[in-house]
């Protein structure tokens, strides 16, 4: 895709699943990738794989819920790679249970990771983009935010907030030539989905139910999401902002 060579791009939750696939794809497109993750060893392993394929990446240990750590991670990225061109807010966490069976501690963790962490990243990175009058932001939400999902009430609330937040920033920063778009994954074959299914009485049956519900007949793969994310970051999407794209194999449709 056009315009990604030598661009400095941060990917949060970059060491696994959708994040890992996105980092690899961006490196293949010639971008300089900062892999932000709490699991530094996993991030380093991914960076080594990217470098072995002639890509450029760095591993940064980052807890997005801690603003001081975020600021330090952003500073380190710019010292090593240069000014930040784009941000992918991919880090997330979920707990799968009916709302009345959740606890206040679980609400707090869900909100801190899925909402506050994302706010921290935007607040730390956007000034760089505003100063340069250019930037791309892709936020990873969920189809749970668009249509609801039983057992994910607080997660869906956080991701729904991310949709509105992204559209608002798309308006506020259009004059700064910064685009904001949102990807809503459907059921995707990642560790997050595995965590959801493992909590069921029959995990394999639940996976099969997810698969049957998808018109294209399979679970999403991380590479499916990486392709959509890469498009929104590229010059090919230069006239696209404030949009929400479901990547779900047709599980949810709108128009």
What are these regions (language model features)?
Residues 100, 147-153, 175-176, 217, ...:
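Active-site loop immediately N-terminal to the catalytic Tyr-X3-Lys motif
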Residues 98-99, 106-111, 210:
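Substrate-binding pocket helix/loop in short-chain dehydrogenase/reductase
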Residues 147, 230, 241-255:
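Short C-terminal tail/terminal secondary-structure segment
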Residues 127, 171-175, 238:
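Alpha-helical segment proximal to the catalytic Tyr-Lys
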Residues 88, 174, 179, 240-242:
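Short, small/polar-rich loop/turn modules that mediate ligand/substrate recognition or access, typified
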Residues 142:
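Residue(s) in the substrate-gating loop at a strand-loop-helix junction
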Residues 122, 158, 166:
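Active-site helix of classical SDR
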């Amino acid at each position: 895709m056009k315009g990604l060579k030598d661009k400095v791009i941060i990917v949060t939750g970059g060491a696994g699943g959708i994040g890992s696939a996105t980092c690899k794809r961006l490196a293949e497109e010639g971008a300089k990738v900062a892999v932000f993750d709490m699991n530094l060893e996993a991030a380093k392993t991914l960076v080594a794989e990217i470098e072995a394929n002639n890509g450029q990446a760095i591993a940064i240990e980052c807890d997005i819920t801690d603003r001081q750590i975020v600021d330090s991670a952003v500073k380190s990225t710019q010292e090593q790679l240069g000014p930040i061109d784009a941000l992918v807010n991919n880090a997330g966490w979920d707990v799968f249970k009916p709302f009345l069976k959740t606890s206040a501690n679980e609400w707090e963790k869900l909100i801190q990771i899925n909402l506050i962490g994302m706010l921290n990243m935007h607040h730390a990175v956007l000034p760089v983009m505003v100063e340069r009058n250019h930037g791309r932001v892709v936020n990873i939400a969920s189809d749970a935010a668009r249509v609801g999902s039983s057992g994910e009430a607080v997660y869906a609330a956080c991701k729904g907030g991310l949709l509105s937040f992204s559209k608002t920033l798309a308006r506020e920063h259009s004059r700064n030539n910064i685009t904001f778009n949102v990807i809503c994954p459907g059921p995707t074959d990642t560790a997050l989905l595995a965590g959801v299914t493992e909590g069921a009485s029959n995990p394999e049956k639940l996976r099969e139910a997810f698969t049957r519900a998808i018109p294209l007949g399979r679970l999403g793969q991380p590479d499916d999401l990486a392709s959509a994310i890469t498009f929104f970051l590229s010059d090919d999407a230069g006239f696209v902002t404030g949009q929400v794209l479901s990547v779900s194999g047709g599980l949810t449709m709108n128009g």
